[in-house]
């Protein structure tokens, strides 16, 4: 399959995808209820989409093309409420979080679709271990070249997105010490990491054609990059976030990314360069391991500061952009989150500490999702 033409899209429109956990109400382990839930939702009216994912213990909800924060919040809230109402008759719980805290990967099954079966055959047990849950945000770009500028410019802020959304400290019943352990599962795939540093669509197309000629990839879906262009939508897709515990936080983070994109496209505070990636992996690890308390190394100034402080410094620059986009409330929430140094990973650990039970903690995350 050749690289698709870059579709025209309205700049700075955005879309949000959330992968959600489906658990039974008996012991709060993952349960393969996606087909039952989708049948129960048949005929309901809502914007956006609700669809199956790689595991039948997972379901994805996604907005349509959103122009502002309020629209995304409304669309996701409606889908959340429909799903929660439908789940009651199925004895099913729905929750956010980047990993299920005690599920055993070998118990998982792979959804019966050609794409997912191909992934399972190609990657073996990695496909079952990929039962992790993320938030993806698409940002509309005015041109294909601008999409590559934005992809590499916004790459500096990947630690922000990871730390703000981090909600996956537990894996198979163990506290990993990470704020976001989910991304360790993604890193196992050979085409993960960062996109190649090219700034024109012609150069990107040449790279794609070479990779396809090797037989390593067939389409853009085979790249598991942290941020990737999506030519069929005319967007870039930011893919590093854990699924937050509430719709509210997911929308706050999406609006933050939208405001940051506007700032980068209109103000051009710097030009992306290859050296930006010298500290990329270190900064990414710090965000995964320590969340908002991790260290951020500035790629040009070579200074160090807490990730939370770097977020707060950028929020000042984003204020006029958030105002223009109608998302000052979201920016205020992001400021408060960064100032508190306390993300969803902190909440999950506290819930487990108080309940002395991972199962009860999952029950509480279901309540969080249903209420927020």
Swiss-Prot record:
It catalyses: L-cysteine + L-glutamate + ATP = gamma-L-glutamyl-L-cysteine + ADP + phosphate + H(+). Keywords: ATP-binding, Ligase, Nucleotide-binding. It comes from the Bacteria. This is Putative glutamate--cysteine ligase 2. HAMAP family: Glu_cys_ligase_2 (MF_01609). GO terms for molecular function: ATP binding; glutamate-cysteine ligase activity. ATP-dependent carboxylate-amine ligase which exhibits weak glutamate--cysteine ligase activity. Pfam families: GCS2. NCBIfam families: gshA_cyan_rel, PRK13516.1. GO terms for biological process: modified amino acid biosynthetic process. PANTHER family: GLUTAMATE--CYSTEINE LIGASE 2-RELATED. The keyword Repeat does not apply. It comes from Cupriavidus metallidurans (strain ATCC 43123 / DSM 2839 / NBRC 102507 / CH34) (Ralstonia metallidurans). Its EC number is 6.3.2.2. It is an enzyme of class 6 (ligase). Belongs to the glutamate--cysteine ligase type 2 family. YbdK subfamily.
């Amino acid at each position: 399959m050749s690289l698709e033409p870059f579709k025209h899209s309205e700049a700075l429109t955005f879309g949000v995808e959330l992968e959600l956990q489906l658990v039974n109400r008996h012991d709060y382990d993952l349960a393969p209820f996606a087909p039952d839930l989708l049948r129960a939702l048949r005929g309901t009216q809502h914007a956006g989409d609700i669809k199956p994912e790689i595991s039948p213990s997972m379901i994805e909800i996604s907005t349509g093309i959103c122009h502002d924060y309020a629209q995304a919040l409304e669309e996701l809230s409606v889908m959340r409420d429909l799903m929660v109402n439908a789940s009651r008759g199925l004895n099913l719980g729905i929750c956010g979080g980047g990993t299920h805290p005690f599920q055993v990967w070998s118990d998982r099954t792979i959804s019966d679709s050609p794409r997912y079966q191909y992934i399972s055959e190609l990657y073996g047990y990695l496909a079952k271990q990929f039962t992790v849950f993320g938030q993806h945000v698409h940002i509309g770009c005015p041109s294909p070249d601008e999409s590559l500028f934005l992809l590499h410019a916004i790459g500096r802020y990947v630690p922000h997105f990871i730390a703000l959304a981090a909600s996956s400290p537990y894996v198979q019943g163990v506290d990993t010490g990470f704020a976001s352990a989910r991304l360790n599962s993604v890193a196992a795939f050979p085409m993960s990491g960062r996109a190649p540093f090219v700034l024109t669509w012609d150069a990107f197309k040449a790279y794609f054609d070479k990779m396809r000629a090797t037989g390593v990839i067939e389409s853009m879906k085979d790249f598991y990059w942290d941020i990737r262009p999506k030519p069929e939508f005319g967007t870039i897709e930011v893919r590093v976030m854990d699924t937050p515990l509430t719709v509210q936080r997911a929308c706050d983070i999406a609006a933050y990314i939208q405001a940051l994109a506007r700032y980068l496209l209109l103000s051009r505070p710097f030009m992306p360069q290859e050296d930006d990636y010298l500290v990329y992996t270190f900064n990414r690890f710090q965000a995964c391991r320590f969340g908002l308390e991790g260290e951020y190394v500035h790629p040009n100034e070579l200074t160090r500061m807490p990730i939370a402080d770097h977020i707060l410094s950028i929020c000042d620059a984003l204020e006029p952009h958030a105002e223009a986009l109608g998302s000052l409330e979201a920016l205020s929430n992001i400021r408060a989150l960064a100032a508190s140094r306390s993300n969803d990973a902190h909440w999950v650990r506290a819930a487990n500490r108080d309940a002395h039970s991972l199962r009860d903690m999952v029950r509480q995350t279901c309540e969080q999702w249903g209420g927020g």
